[in-house]
C-alpha cells in the first residue's frame, strides 16, 4: 500500500502556539499515526545550506542529506527506517517526500542530483533505492567497513 505524503516542511517552534514542542513532542501531538500519511520535519533552524540536514519521519525513521554541493546542486542521502516499519512502504514514502521538498523550482536549495553510497550486502536498501528510481553509477571495491570487514559500496544516483 503506497503512502500518501501530506505536508513536507521544516518544523519550526514559532509555527505552533506551544513553544515547548520538540521533534519528539511534535511526533506525539501533531503527526497522524495512520497508515496513509507521513510528514518530514527538521529541527528549528536546520537548513541544507549548512552542508547537512537530518529530516525525521517520526516514528518511521529519518533521512540525512550530507555532502551538499550548492554549485552543482547535489547531495548525498542516507536513510534509516525503524525495524518495525521496514518493508511497509515508509522508506519509499520518505524518499519521495524528500525529493518533493528539494525539486521546487524557486527553492534556493533545489537539487539536481541525489546519490547514496550503499554497502553491497545491504540488499534491502539497494532494492529500495532502485524502486525509487535510482540507478547504479559507481562501484567501490572494499570501500566500507561493515560487520567487521571491508565490503564493496554501490553508488546509486537519481537526477531529479
Please tell me what each predicted stretch does.
Residues 74, 105-118:
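Conserved GNAT acetyl-CoA-binding A-motif
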Residues 115-118, 135-152:
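Conserved catalytic-core motifs of GNAT/GCN5-like acyltransferases
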Residues 86, 116-126, 144:
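Conserved beta-strand-loop-alpha-helix junction that forms the acyl-donor binding cleft
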Residues 8-16, 23-32, 36:
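Long, intrinsically disordered low-complexity tandem-repeat segments
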Residues 87-104, 126-131:
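Conserved acetyl-CoA-binding loop-helix of GNAT-fold acetyltransferases
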Residues 57-61, 124, 150:
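Glycine-rich acetyl-CoA-binding "A-motif" of GNAT/NAT acetyltransferases
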Residues 129, 134, 156:
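Conserved active-site tyrosine of GNAT-family acetyltransferases
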Residues 1-9, 34-45, 49-86, 101, ...:
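Acetyl-CoA-dependent GNAT
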Amino acid at each position: 500500500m503506497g503512502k500518501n505524503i501530506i505536508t513536507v516542511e521544516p518544523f519550526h517552534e514559532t509555527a505552533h502556539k506551544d513553544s515547548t514542542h520538540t521533534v519528539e513532542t511534535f511526533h506525539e501531538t501533531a503527526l497522524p499515526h495512520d497508515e496513509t500519511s507521513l510528514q518530514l520535519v527538521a529541527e528549528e533552524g536546520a537548513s541544507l545550506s549548512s552542508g547537512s540536514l537530518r529530516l525525521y519521519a517520526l516514528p518511521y525513521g529519518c533521512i540525512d542529506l550530507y555532502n551538499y554541493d550548492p554549485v552543482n546542486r547535489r547531495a548525498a542521502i542516507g536513510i534509516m527506517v525503524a525495524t518495525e516499519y521496514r518493508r511497509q512502504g515508509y522508506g519509499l514514502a520518505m524518499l519521495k517526500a524528500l525529493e518533493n521538498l528539494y525539486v521546487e523550482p524557486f527553492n534556493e536549495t533545489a537539487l539536481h542530483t541525489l546519490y547514496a553510497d550503499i554497502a553491497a550486502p545491504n540488499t534491502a536498501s539497494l532494492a529500495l533505492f532502485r524502486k525509487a528510481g535510482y540507478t547504479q553509477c559507481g562501484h567501490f571495491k572494499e570501500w566500507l567497513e561493515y560487520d567487521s570487514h571491508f565490503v564493496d559500496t554501490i553508488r546509486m544516483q537519481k537526477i531529479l
